[in-house]
Amino acid sequence: FFAGTSEIDNTDWVISMGHFMGLLDSNWLGFPANRKMTFLRYADFNCIRNGKLVRSGFFCDLIGVMHQLGIHPLPPQTGASFIYPGPRTHDGILLAPQDPSESTKTLKLVNRMCQDLEDLNVSGDDYPPPSLLAKTWCEDMIWYGPAGIGASYTIPRYQEQHQYPFRSGLKDKVFNGHLCRL
């Protein structure tokens, strides 16, 4: 998880993501029980004001649950499917104060990436060159996409396995803005 102040409206947010695991011993949301371990990938956004939760957003990968049950509502995914790992070095929890200049530099990079992608949406170009993403992404980046898309390694494979099919296959897409930006 991580927390911080949103640059959109100066509100405080706590965010977590991961996998819930349980035994699917009963039918759930119309999905048949499989009596096996079942994993639900999620991301949870919570706005806190005066010590109370005032707004939340919860996103979960129900298509991933369906895949575990042998139900495939979408065409075959183009990327790999597996339980995505945590940080590569497994030292993602930072308990000591960090260099604010490094945080500022990282935030500027993420915001530049978001702006590049927003500009791309406005342009209508569904097949941008790899050099566009290389402005803010490392060549050996890994995309951990949801079920139906899957994971990809390297910018060219990300574009082949996710970006190009997604952009060309999803017409009339609308960006409604960010819930928060930390």
Model regions and ranges:
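C-terminal and inter-domain tail/linker signature
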Residues: 1-182
